[in-house]
Amino acid sequence: MLRDMSHAKPTDDTIAILETASQLRNLGWGAYFWDQVEATELEQSPPVRITQVHRNTLHIQGANLDLMIPSLHDVTVGDWLLFNREDPRSSQLLERKSLIKRRAPGHDRKEQLIAANLDTAFIVSSCNNDFSVARLERYIAMAHEADVTPVIVLTKIDLAKNIVEFVSKAKAISKRVAVVSLNARDPSASSYLFQWCQPGQTVAFLGSSGVGKSTLANTLAGNETIETQEVRASDDKGRHTTTGRQLHIMPSGCAVLDTPGMRELQLTDVSIGLEETFADLHALRQNCRFNDCAHDKEPDCAVQAAITSGKVDVPRMQRWLKLVAEDVENTKILAKRRMREKSKNKNVKSVRKHSLKK
């Protein structure tokens, strides 16, 4: 005798809830964001994620939502909003679990937000003249500071003659950072990145132009949704194909951020990131006689002692000192700028308040 299971069938409301949860998970929604909202809020203000930032508009996506809305202040790709349907400009920005940023290029020293709420940063470099340990160290420090897992991805191994040398140099940067070498055009490349590209995860491809970031995103997607270009044969330099940061949802349920190449990567507010990237040098620093030791000619300098004994690589130490000095300088400059802007905004509010009283 067959049991009547009709009562066990999910209702339309249950199906809708499950579909909504699945769509949000694929966009990167998880426990960190659930903890910030009440169920009653979601009825009026559904969660949406910023997938692209344009000059005057934002592209947002959510459960059964795909819209362009007016720009908001201080938001970036990857941010989550509680969307205000009646007044999009009043949408609430949820607290970020991570934020990648840099000092904006040029003379106007501003802070530039790169991406929010990432889980993993794939730092991509070609096995050719583009390869730079110094650049990789910058990206790794930036990722560590944001509490994002950095992974070095070496591409174009099919064209390289000395792959082992590139891999060895990449692994020497930090014992805490995984190194993967692959051919970005090979369909099997996605299997090397699979452990970081699980459903609900958000990953980003960072690196110079022409290293294969968009190609890797296409490989993960299983199609050519993102335009790519070849590098110049003369110097292995890439051409800008991706002109803006855009979040793509993969068939696997992973959100992938493709970014344009960054010619300049000035660090700011990354003291902890530098400590983690250069953990061995930071540990030595604690043993110096003076807290403000410049590791040059000061007495009882633990770093100089390690250099003399051959335990420390001199070029690496010099890069570390350069990055520490750069971070201190940029952090001070941007802090002063924030104070000026805060004071300016306060004065504007005060003037408006007095005007209303009149």
Regions found by a protein language model. Give the residues of each.
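Conserved beta-strand segments of the P-loop GTPase G domain that flank and frequently precede/overlap
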Residues: F122-S126, V153-T155
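Short aromatic-glycine-enriched beta-strand elements
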Residues: N56-I60
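Short, charged beta-turn/beta-strand-edge "cap" motif at the junction between a beta-strand
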Residues: R85-S90, C127-N129, S209
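Helix-rich effector regions associated with P-loop NTPase G domains
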Residues: M1-T20, E41-Q44, V77-W80, N84-P88, ...
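Beta-strand/loop nucleic-acid-binding surfaces
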Residues: A63-V77
